[in-house]
Amino acid sequence: MKRLLLATAVSLLTATTAMAQTVYIVRHAEKVDDSADAALSEAGQARARALADALRDAHPVLVLTSPLQRTVQTAAQTAEYHSAPSETVSLEGGGAAHIAAVAARVRALPEDAVVLIVGHSNTVPDIARALGYEAAADMPECEYDRMTRLTVDGGAVQAVISRYGAPSDC
């Protein structure tokens, strides 16, 4: 009986201390043109479907995007699949203000939350850095297939970089 109680106590302690946020950060998928608020191209729509497929077991509780339609469209299928609310984070005040607001929103979530962030090539690395992943590499304009998964446990951050969808033409 003592062993059972000890095993139960250890199990509860492990479950309590194993809570960590999981943050997936991707760039929006391919766009139709270089206009300021371009929609997704056919390749981008395929990548958005691939993102939803790649995250089918992730169960995000929140999806964060910029207000530009290419980020919203990239995130839509994943948010819909998981019935996760999608919030846009303003670009007013510039990139630094946007990055700070995204990081603050993530930090306000429960410590065991799973969140998807869809950003831009010039914000994705800085968002990762703002969340504690100092080694985040800059993202070339031609790269669309990088997914950064951060596990944030208190002050400790672990990162896993993976690829999804068709390989980027870089």
Give the location of each predicted region.
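Short beta-strand segments
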Residues: V118-H120
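Active-site-proximal alpha-helix that buttresses catalytic centers in soluble enzyme cores
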Residues: A20-D112, V124-A130, A135-C170
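Bacterial N-terminal signal peptides
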Residues: A7-A15
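Positively charged n-region of N-terminal signal peptides that target proteins for export
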Residues: M1-L4
